[in-house]
């Protein structure tokens, strides 16, 4: 692979928006390694509007982004590094609606809002799940963009009547940065409206949806043009340059679904599975083509698009959300922060494998009293077991982590069988790669070595796509992953020896 001239480094800014926080990271790339510097972090989370609906305060996110970009510019100047690109990634499915003047109609709904309850079943009565899957390849999730649109888009809806364009969250931010409206394909593949084979909007699904739901007849015209990762979106608007102190920096499309960026930076071998571990765990394989069989649909696997024409064949399983919500509830009850390292150490000392709950149950999706929900789920398995395992917080944490590891192991085993791939290792990237107990339990549950890291996989993937787009690095995915191996600390967990 080619590299930058000796001693010369370039800067790339990754705007990484998650469901609980957003960050602005400066990636300093010399062609062989990437150094990441956090330049801004700000909270995120759904807020209830006057009707009790959950929405994202994207204007607060925008203020955090501008502050982070200003800080990134300061850091780059201190280091003598030129910022050559900016890329945006975020969580999937949620979107903003723009009116004819390009203004946001309302704050975007959160995928956890209850407005989609029951909507998928209504849609499937008109366009079956099997017909959906044959085109979009997506597992059943009740909150995809399609189902949100059915819940909120109709001719009688005042907001929808004003809509000229729909932009997914990272594309909305890119629009505010540049003034150009596009849809990056990896995130667009989570909408339910894309053809997994052609990587284009599905005329078939859109026509059938319009026929079934006349209020959505104009949806196709509201969807922007699709672009692949690495495409130039545009340069910073003058107002953004003034607000941040940055120059005429190019904004580049990256793998804007955060999981797509994370998988791009997972140093995978040809037969490795991955777990992108955060609020959700995205568990699966990287494939050259989608798997659209009936068996795959029945197993509820999804085909989301990845970098360089790849497919992320995966299942969304519950991630650290359940544990995080328990910790939040305990901190609120105690009036003090929870000692999470101490809690995890105590959980490791608990007997394992006594109880596995279905962490993918709908009862765990919404915020709320998560300790009680987990306790109730255990109770449904038997009162004696309930009293034995949930009497202490460490025991409850052990139940959660055992259950998460088991869910990931099941997903890997099923993906392997459905795709015809013999998996020889598991790569865990993202925040969950720092949870040593969960990594060890995953190695035991899968019977495979687990390689943990990088923690900052999403930001690394974001930066590397930008760096390749402008020629600072070159090569295919293997070459990009060589840069990751040189840049990140990886840790290996071996499965327990079999007796």
Language-model segments: what does each one mean?
Residues 80-90, 165, 418-430:
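Short glycine-rich phosphate-binding loop at a beta-alpha junction
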Residues 89-92, 229-230, 277-280, 425-433:
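Glycine-rich beta-strand-to-loop/alpha-helix junction loops that act as flexible
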Residues 1-106, 241-252, 446-448, 477:
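N-terminal glycine/serine-rich phosphate-binding loop of ATP-dependent small-molecule kinases
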Residues 2-5, 13-14, 124-136, 147-168, ...:
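Active-site core segments that coordinate phosphate-bearing ligands/cofactors
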Residues 109-128:
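Short alpha-helix plus adjacent loop in nuclease-associated cores
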Residues 74-111, 136-143, 174-195, 227-228:
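Short beta-strand-loop/turn "lid" adjacent to the catalytic site in phosphate-handling enzymes
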């Amino acid at each position: 692979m080619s590299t930058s001239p000796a001693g010369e480094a370039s800067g790339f800014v990754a705007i990484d928006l998650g469901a609980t926080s957003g960050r602005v990271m400066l990636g300093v790339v010399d062609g062989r390694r990437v150094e990441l510097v956090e330049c801004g972090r700000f909270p995120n989370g759904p807020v209830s509007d006057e009707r009790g609906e959950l929405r994202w305060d994207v204007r607060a996110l925008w203020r955090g982004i501008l502050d982070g970009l200003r800080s990134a510019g300061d850091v780059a100047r201190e280091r003598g590094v030129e910022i050559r690109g900016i890329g945006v990634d975020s969580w999937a499915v949620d979107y903003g609606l723009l009116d004819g003047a390009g203004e946001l109609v309302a704050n975007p709904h959160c995928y956890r809002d209850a407005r989609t309850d029951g909507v998928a079943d209504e849609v499937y009565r008109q366009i079956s799940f099997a017909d959906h899957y044959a085109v979009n390849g997506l597992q059943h999730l009740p909150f995809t963009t399609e189902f949100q649109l059915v819940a909120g888009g109709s001719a009688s809806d005042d907001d929808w009547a004003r809509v000229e364009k729909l932009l997914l969250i990272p594309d909305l931010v890119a629009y505010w940065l540049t003034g150009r409206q596009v849809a990056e394909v990896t995130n667009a593949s989570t909408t339910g409206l894309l053809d997994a084979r052609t990587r284009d909007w599905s005329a078939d699904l859109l026509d059938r949806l319009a026929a079934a739901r006349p209020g959505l007849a104009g949806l196709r015209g509201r969807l922007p043009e699709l672009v692949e990762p690495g495409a130039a979106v545009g340069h910073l608007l003058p107002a953004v340059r003034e607000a941040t102190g940055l120059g005429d920096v190019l904004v580049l499309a990256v793998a804007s679904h955060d999981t797509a960026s994370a998988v791009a930076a997972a140093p995978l071998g040809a037969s490795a599975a991955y777990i992108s571990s955060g609020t959700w765990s995205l568990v699966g394989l990287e494939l050259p083509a989608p798997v659209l069989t009936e068996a795959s649909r029945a197993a509820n696997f999804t085909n989301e698009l990845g970098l360089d024409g790849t497919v992320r064949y995966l299942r969304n399983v519950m991630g650290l959300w359940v544990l995080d919500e328990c910790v939040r509830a305990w901190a609120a009850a105690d009036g003090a922060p929870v000692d999470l390292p101490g809690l995890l150490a105590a959980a490791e000392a608990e007997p394992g494998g006594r109880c596995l709950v279905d962490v993918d149950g709908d009862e765990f999706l919404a915020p709320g009293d998560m300790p009680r929900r987990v306790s109730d789920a255990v109770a449904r398995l038997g009162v004696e077991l309930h009293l034995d395992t949930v009497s202490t917080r460490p025991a409850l944490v052990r139940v959660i982590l055992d259950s998460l590891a088991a869910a990931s192991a099941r997903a890997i085993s099923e993906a392997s069988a459905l795709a015809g791939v013999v998996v020889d290792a598991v790569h865990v990237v993202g925040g969950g790669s720092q949870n040593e107990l969960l990594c060890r339990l995953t190695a035991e549950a899968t019977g495979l070595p687990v390689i943990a890291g990088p923690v900052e996989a999403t930001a690394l993937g974001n930066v590397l796509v930008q760096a390749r787009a402008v020629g600072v690095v070159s090569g295919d995915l293997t070459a990009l992953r060589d840069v990751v191996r040189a840049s990140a600390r990886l840790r290996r967990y071996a499965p327990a020896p079999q007796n």
